[in-house]
C-alpha cells in the first residue's frame, strides 16, 4: 500500500518516498483535453453539465445550511477544486454567488465581495477556462442583482466576483489556514493521485497485466485501487479541514457505484473497461503496440461505493456528514440521434478522448493514440444500442461541515 490508511486519523497522511515521484509525474500530465477541438473537454462535457444541474438542489441546500450558521463577512471566498477547462465550473460558481447573495439580502444586508479560486493540476488548460470568464462587474455596470439576473454560467454579461487560478493537486494543501468559506468539487475526486504501485508491478499479486482499468480485474487489483482511493480521500479531507473557515461548507460529487464489489465499476466500467479495453487489445493484436505497453497503462479512476466514502470521512473525523447520497445520473453520451450508431460511436470515442486522451498520448504517442480512439469508435458503433440503453453513471453526492 503506497499511502497508509493507518495514518488517516492523524494530522497528516504520509506519502512514501517511492510514491512521491509517481504522483508528481501524473500531476504533471493529467488533465482533461484542452482547447476547443472535437475531442476537447470543452466540447464533450455536456453530460457533466446535465448531471451538475440535476444536483443543483443539493448544492443549494448545502449553501442554505452554511448561511444559517455563518457570520456575515464583507468578503466571501469560494474554491472550486478540479475546475477543468469547461463552463461547468463557472455554472457552479454562479449558483454559489446567487444563493449567498440572496441569503445576505434576506437578512437586510449588502451582499459581500466575492473571491473565487479555480483550482486544478498545473497541466490543466487554464487559458481556455479563463477565456470563458465574462469581464468583471464594473461599479458603473449596475447592481449585483442586475448582473445576476442577466443570465447564468458563461452567458452572464459580467461576473460579480474576483477570479484567480490556483494550480496544484487537491490531495495536498492549496490555501492558507481558515481562508475558504465554501469548497466545491464536482466530478473530480474519482481521479486518483496515482495508479497504485502494485498494479504496475509484474511481480505483485495485484499486477493488472492485460487490462487497463480496475473494472473486471482481480480481487487483488480491486483492493489496491480501493486502498489508493481511501488514502487519497483522507489526504484531501485533512487539507480542506485546515483551509476551511469555521462555519464553512464543502459540496462534493464524484463517480460512485451501486455494487459492493470494487471490480464492478458500473458506468465507469462501461466507459473504460469494455470497448476502451478492447480497443487496446486490437492494437496489440495488430502489432501497433506491444503487449507490455498496454500492460503498463492503467486508468487512475476509482468509483467508490457510498459505504467506502462514508468510512473514510468518519475515520478522518474532521468533518460532519450533513448529507451523503448515491444518486443515479444520466449517460455520459449526449447524442441528438440515439438510433444513429455512428453518432453514438463518435460520442463514446470523444468522451473517452476528452478525459483520458492526454494520458493515452503521453503513453503511446499521438499517432497511435488516434488509432486507439478510431478502434474505440468503431467498436462503440457496433454496440450502440447497448451503450445507449445500459450506460449510466451513479454519483456520490456529499455535503460536509467541520465537526464540532
From Swiss-Prot:
<dbReference type="GO" id="GO:0046872">
    <property type="term" value="F:metal ion binding"/>
</dbReference>
<dbReference type="InterPro" id="IPR042086">
    <property type="entry name" value="MeTrfase_capping"/>
</dbReference>
<keyword id="KW-0489">Methyltransferase</keyword>
<feature type="binding site">
    <location>
        <position position="88"/>
    </location>
    <ligand>
        <name>S-adenosyl-L-methionine</name>
    </ligand>
</feature>
<feature type="binding site">
    <location>
        <begin position="186"/>
        <end position="188"/>
    </location>
    <ligand>
        <name>S-adenosyl-L-methionine</name>
    </ligand>
</feature>
<feature type="binding site">
    <location>
        <position position="208"/>
    </location>
    <ligand>
        <name>Mg(2+)</name>
    </ligand>
</feature>
<keyword id="KW-0808">Transferase</keyword>
<dbReference type="InterPro" id="IPR029063">
    <property type="entry name" value="SAM-dependent_MTases_sf"/>
</dbReference>
<dbReference type="GO" id="GO:0032259">
    <property type="term" value="P:methylation"/>
</dbReference>
<feature type="binding site">
    <location>
        <position position="297"/>
    </location>
    <ligand>
        <name>Mg(2+)</name>
    </ligand>
</feature>
<dbReference type="GO" id="GO:0051749">
    <property type="term" value="F:indole acetic acid carboxyl methyltransferase activity"/>
</dbReference>
<dbReference type="GO" id="GO:0140964">
    <property type="term" value="P:intracellular auxin homeostasis"/>
</dbReference>
<feature type="binding site">
    <location>
        <position position="120"/>
    </location>
    <ligand>
        <name>S-adenosyl-L-methionine</name>
    </ligand>
</feature>
<dbReference type="GO" id="GO:0103007">
    <property type="term" value="F:indole-3-acetate carboxyl methyltransferase activity"/>
</dbReference>
<keyword id="KW-0479">Metal-binding</keyword>
<keyword id="KW-0949">S-adenosyl-L-methionine</keyword>
<dbReference type="Pfam" id="PF03492">
    <property type="entry name" value="Methyltransf_7"/>
</dbReference>
<comment type="similarity">
    <text>Belongs to the methyltransferase superfamily. SABATH family.</text>
</comment>
<feature type="binding site">
    <location>
        <position position="212"/>
    </location>
    <ligand>
        <name>Mg(2+)</name>
    </ligand>
</feature>
<feature type="binding site">
    <location>
        <position position="295"/>
    </location>
    <ligand>
        <name>Mg(2+)</name>
    </ligand>
</feature>
<comment type="function">
    <text>Catalyzes the methylation of the free carboxyl end of the plant hormone indole-3-acetic acid (IAA). Converts IAA to IAA methyl ester (MeIAA). Regulates IAA activities by IAA methylation. Methylation of IAA plays an important role in regulating plant development and auxin homeostasis. MeIAA seems to be an inactive form of IAA.</text>
</comment>
<feature type="binding site">
    <location>
        <position position="298"/>
    </location>
    <ligand>
        <name>Mg(2+)</name>
    </ligand>
</feature>
<comment type="subunit">
    <text>Homodimer.</text>
</comment>
<keyword id="KW-0460">Magnesium</keyword>
<feature type="binding site">
    <location>
        <begin position="82"/>
        <end position="83"/>
    </location>
    <ligand>
        <name>S-adenosyl-L-methionine</name>
    </ligand>
</feature>
<protein>
    <recommendedName>
        <fullName>Indole-3-acetate O-methyltransferase 1</fullName>
        <ecNumber>2.1.1.278</ecNumber>
    </recommendedName>
</protein>
<dbReference type="InterPro" id="IPR005299">
    <property type="entry name" value="MeTrfase_7"/>
</dbReference>
<feature type="binding site">
    <location>
        <position position="294"/>
    </location>
    <ligand>
        <name>Mg(2+)</name>
    </ligand>
</feature>
<dbReference type="GO" id="GO:0008757">
    <property type="term" value="F:S-adenosylmethionine-dependent methyltransferase activity"/>
</dbReference>
<feature type="binding site">
    <location>
        <begin position="169"/>
        <end position="171"/>
    </location>
    <ligand>
        <name>S-adenosyl-L-methionine</name>
    </ligand>
</feature>
Amino acid at each position: 500500500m503506497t499511502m497508509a490508511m493507518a495514518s488517516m486519523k492523524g494530522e497528516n497522511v504520509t506519502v512514501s518516498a517511492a510514491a512521491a515521484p509517481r504522483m508528481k509525474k501524473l500531476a504533471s500530465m493529467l488533465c482533461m483535453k484542452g482547447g476547443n477541438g472535437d475531442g476537447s473537454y470543452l466540447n464533450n462535457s455536456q453530460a457533466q453539465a446535465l448531471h451538475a444541474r440535476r444536483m443543483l438542489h443539493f448544492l443549494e441546500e448545502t449553501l442554505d445550511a452554511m448561511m444559517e450558521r455563518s457570520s456575515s463577512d464583507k468578503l466571501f471566498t469560494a474554491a472550486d477544486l478540479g475546475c477543468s477547462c469547461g463552463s461547468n465550473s463557472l455554472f457552479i460558481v454562479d449558483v454559489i454567488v446567487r444563493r449567498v447573495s440572496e441569503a445576505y439580502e434576506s437578512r437586510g444586508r449588502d451582499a459581500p465581495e466575492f473571491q473565487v479560486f479555480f483550482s486544478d493540476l498545473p497541466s490543466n488548460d487554464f487559458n481556455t477556462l479563463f477565456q470563458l470568464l465574462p469581464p468583471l462587474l464594473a461599479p458603473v455596470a449596475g447592481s449585483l442583482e442586475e448582473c445576476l439576473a442577466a443570465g447564468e454560467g458563461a452567458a452572464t454579461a459580467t461576473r460579480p466576483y474576483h477570479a484567480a487560478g490556483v494550480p496544484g493537486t487537491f490531495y495536498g494543501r492549496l490555501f492558507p489556514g481558515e481562508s475558504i468559506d465554501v469548497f466545491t468539487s464536482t466530478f473530480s475526486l474519482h481521479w486518483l493521485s496515482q495508479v497504485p504501485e502494485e498494479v504496475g508491478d509484474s511481480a505483485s499479486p495485484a499486477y493488472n497485466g492485460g487490462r487497463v482499468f480496475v473494472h473486471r480485474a482481480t480481487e487483488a487489483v480491486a483492493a489496491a485501487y480501493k486502498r489508493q482511493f481511501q488514502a487519497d480521500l483522507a489526504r484531501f479531507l485533512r487539507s480542506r479541514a485546515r483551509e476551511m473557515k469555521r462555519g464553512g461548507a464543502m459540496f462534493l460529487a464524484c463517480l460512485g457505484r451501486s455494487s459492493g464489489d470494487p471490480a464492478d465499476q458500473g458506468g465507469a466500467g462501461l466507459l473504460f473497461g469494455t470497448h476502451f479495453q478492447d480497443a487496446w487489445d486490437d492494437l496489440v493484436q495488430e502489432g501497433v503496440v506491444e503487449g507490455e505497453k498496454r500492460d503498463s497503462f492503467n486508468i487512475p479512476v476509482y468509483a467508490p461505493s457510498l459505504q467506502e466514502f462514508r468510512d473514510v470521512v468518519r475515520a478522518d473525523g474532521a468533518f460532519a456528514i450533513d448529507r451523503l447520497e448515491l444518486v443515479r445520473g444520466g449517460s455520459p453520451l449526449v447524442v441528438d440521434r440515439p438510433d444513429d450508431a455512428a453518432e453514438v460511436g463518435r460520442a463514446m470515442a470523444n468522451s473517452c478522448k476528452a478525459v483520458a486522451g492526454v494520458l493515452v498520448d503521453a503513453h503511446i504517442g499521438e499517432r497511435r493514440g488516434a488509432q486507439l480512439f478510431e478502434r474505440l469508435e468503431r467498436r462503440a458503433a457496433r454496440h450502440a444500442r447497448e451503450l445507449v440503453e445500459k450506460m449510466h453513471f451513479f454519483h456520490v453526492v456529499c455535503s460536509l461541515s467541520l465537526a464540532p
